[in-house]
């Protein structure tokens, strides 16, 4: 199976001023695309060549896992944001956040703290566990909740390439800007 770079759900300049067109040109057009290209170079002639992306992630190790997971993580991240995003969730997701964290404000503070304090490169995630409870986790490098049996609802990429053009070393400023873009409809659609 040959993988292709998924289309962004918005134009390259649609997230500005929070995330610039230049950042998306590099992050999506170069970084994400490189993971797709590398995965396509690594899987021919292996047991993974006819598997779906999710099957590869669940079974692979090393370079194949890293590139497959980064393709999936980035695609999920692009959908976690919207030019019409921000605000607060509604309906079932709002209720689940209040039940798990006490309030939206408490959730936002905990998620921001997790994202800001993730050491090195990684991801901050809002996930749903097997019991239906919501949790905030971080994964390092190419880690993904899928391999931990968790259902991803929302993610914030905290690899430096996600924010360095716009925010330099000010990760907390990038995280604050992320809240203006959060696609709550997408997060809600992932709720089981």
From Swiss-Prot:
Keywords: Iron, Metal-binding, Oxidoreductase. Its cofactor is Fe cation. Fe cation binds at residues 27, 74, 157, 161. It holds the Pfam family Sod_Fe_N. Belongs to the iron/manganese superoxide dismutase family. Homodimer. This is Superoxide dismutase [Fe]. The gene is sodB.
């Amino acid at each position: 199976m040959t993988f292709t770079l998924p289309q962004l759900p918005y134009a390259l300049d649609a997230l500005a001023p929070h995330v610039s067109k230049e950042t998306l040109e590099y992050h999506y057009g170069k970084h994400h695309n490189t993971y797709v290209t590398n995965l396509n170079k690594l899987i021919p002639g292996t047991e993974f060549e006819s598997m779906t992306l999710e099957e590869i992630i669940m079974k692979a190790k090393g370079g194949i896992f890293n590139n497959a997971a980064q393709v999936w993580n980035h695609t999920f991240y692009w959908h976690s944001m919207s030019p019409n995003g921000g605000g607060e969730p509604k309906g079932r997701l709002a209720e689940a956040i209040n039940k798990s964290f006490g309030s939206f404000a408490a959730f936002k503070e905990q998620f921001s703290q997790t994202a800001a304090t993730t050491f090195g490169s990684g991801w901050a995630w809002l996930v749903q566990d097997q019991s239906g409870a919501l949790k905030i986790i971080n994964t390092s490098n190419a880690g993904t909740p899928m391999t931990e049996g968790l259902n991803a609802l929302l993610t914030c990429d905290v690899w430096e390439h996600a924010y360095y053009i716009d925010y330099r070393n000010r990760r907390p400023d990038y995280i604050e800007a992320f809240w203006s873009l959060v696609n709550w409809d997408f997060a809600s659609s992932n709720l089981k």
